[in-house]
Regions:
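Structured C-terminal helix/loop/strand segments within mature extracytoplasmic catalytic/sensor domains
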Residues: 277-347
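Active-site SXXK
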Residues: 20, 42, 59-85, 113, ...
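Active-site Gly/Thr loop motif
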Residues: 238-296
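Peripheral terminal and inter-domain segments
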Residues: 330-480
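A short, well-structured edge-of-sheet supersecondary motif
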Residues: 18-54, 84, 290-293
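Active-site helix/loop module of the DD-peptidase/beta-lactamase fold
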Residues: 79-118, 139, 168-204, 209
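Active-site-proximal binding-pocket segments
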Residues: 182-242
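Active-site-proximal alpha-helical segments within enzyme catalytic domains
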Residues: 116, 156-163, 203-226, 281-298
């Protein structure tokens, strides 16, 4: 079981003040971090969690899951149960149309799927709409010859995960547990969500685990698959998986993502490679400095947010490694410890008091038909907290929020854990930010702008799978 030593940052050549500057830069740029872990030479020098997140909180890892699928495929290949040059269609005859699969699909190999050079330009399950995501991968008409063009295809990785489960007779995470995760002390509570048909682990995006879990796996990968003299993962496969196999340049949104793609691993600048999940779920290894950075966050809706994480780390930490030494003065480290242990989930910035409160407190507004199905709303305030009352198609609901702080609760209708904070963004406007912190990770804005006897409500959800009824703009009038 892996239990990493925690050390003073300067003991491994990293500045305590640099780590503080890194985290503060992210907060200054309004990047909603959930955790940060920095390791060098196998020793942790920073481990910070943003309350209510803790070391033991499971976090949705999104596409970090893809790298775990890759490791499972590598293990199957090492066992001789598959070849990377096998054609995927040969393993799923039961999922194919009666007329047979498209010739492009018949050509597709496991290796091409690992490198995101499939025959689909988009996720097939988003096109087909079927709850059987594996079936849709084979039935949706391909766009192009495989092995040619980089196209980020989550359905492809999901199908590779289904292959692992089909050949092993085990769920994806259970197979990995038996092969190496249990030896690392990977969380027993970790799990992978299922596809809509309830039959297959969501190999493309469904894993919920702790940041420590991800750190442990990346550490073993960084050691060429070896732990304590035992080869847990095939080193030859890892050497191929963690170098550039395909070119995402022009197909990806950030400079880091354009550096290259391996076998479900992203290449980075500074000669690194990464597990990379939507929203800022990262585990990055930099061989040149023997450094691992792990983050969890929610930058969905924050344009360039992931690149800001990379840039802040490079500017404040990476570029100064080995430029400092520990001289016995604990003052910097004591400040660092206080900082490291006092992080909290960011709140909505703005003003936290306004004359608007006296005008709208307890006032009810009613609405005609609108995209969100809201029929009436009311806001009440009590000191630094408030409540948003509303009625929609599912009934009467309450959302509690803080002014300058988060109020934690379960979100109405969905029962997902969330934190809600609000601020006055103009003389006539209140903006509520909801941060979903559950197996779903995302955020939502509810903007209320008042003029005379009218209110305009803007609801915007930034989340992949749920809350579609919380997205729209509509106006209502003060009730008589």
């Amino acid at each position: 079981m892996l239990d990493f030593e925690k050390v003073i940052p300067e003991d491994v050549g990293i500045s305590s003040t640099g780590l503080i500057s890194f985290a503060r830069k992210l907060e200054y740029n309004n990047i909603p971090m959930h955790s940060i872990i920095v390791m060098r030479h196998g020793k942790i020098c920073m481990e910070s969690y943003y309350a209510p997140y803790t070391r033991d909180t499971l976090h949705r890892m999104f596409s970090v899951t893809k790298s775990f699928v890759s490791l499972a495929i590598g293990l199957l290949a090492d066992e001789g149960r598959i070849s990377l040059d096998d054609h995927i269609a040969d393993y799923f005859p039961e999922k194919q149309p009666e007329t047979g699969v498209h010739p492009y699909m018949q050509m597709l190999t496991i290796r091409q799927m690992l490198t995101m050079r499939t025959c689909h330009d988009k996720n097939a399950y988003k096109i087909g709409g079927s709850p059987d995501w594996v079936g849709s991968f084979f039935t949706v008409t391909p766009d192009h010859v495989p092995g040619t063009n980089f196209s980020y295809d989550t359905a492809s990785t999901h199908t590779l995960g289904a292959l692992v489960e089909k050949l092993t007779g085990m769920e994806l995470l259970d197979y990995l547990r038996t092969k190496f995760l249990d030896e690392l002390g990977f969380s027993k509570e970790a799990f992978i969500l299922k596809s809509p048909d309830g039959k297959v682990s969501m190999g493309g995006s469904g894993m919920c685990a702790t940041p420590q879990d991800i750190l442990k796996v990346m550490y073993v990968v960084s050691q060429n698959g070896k732990l304590g003299g035992k080869q847990l993962l095939p080193s030859g496969y890892l050497k191929e998986a963690t170098v550039k196999q395909s070119d995402p340049y022009g197909k990806s949104g950030t400079w880091e993502e354009m550096q290259g793609y391996g076998y479900q691993f992203w290449m980075t600048t500074h000669n690194g490679y990464a597990f990379f999940g939507m929203g800022g779920q990262l585990a990055i290894y930099y061989p040149d400095k023997d450094v691992i950075l792990v983050t969890t966050a929610d930058v969905q809706g924050r344009q360039g947010g992931v690149q800001l994480i990379y840039d802040a780390f490079y500017e404040e930490v990476y570029s100064h490694i080995d430029a400092c030494t520990y001289n016995g003065d604990n003052s910097d480290y004591e400040e660092f410890q206080k900082f490291e242990n006092s992080r909290q989930l960011l709140v909505q910035p703005g003003e936290y008091s306004s004359d608007l409160v006296s005008k709208i407190n307890g006032q009810s507004y009613e609405f005609d038909d609108n995209p969100c199905g809201v029929t009436d709303i009311k806001l009440t305030f009590n000191g630094d907290e408030g409540t948003f009352f509303y009625t929609n198609a599912t009934g009467n609901h309450e959302l509690h929020f803080g002014l300058g702080k988060n109020v934690f609760q379960n979100f109405p209708d969905y029962n997902f854990k969330c934190g809600a904070s609000a601020a006055f963004r103009a003389d006539n406007n209140l903006l509520i930010k909801v941060q979903i912190i559950d197996s779903s990770v995302g955020n939502m804005y509810i903007s209320l702008s008042y003029i005379d006897d009218y209110v305009t409500v803007m609801m915007r959800k930034i989340e992949e799978s749920y809350f579609t009824e919380y997205d729209g703009v509509f106006s209502g009038k003060l009730k008589n």
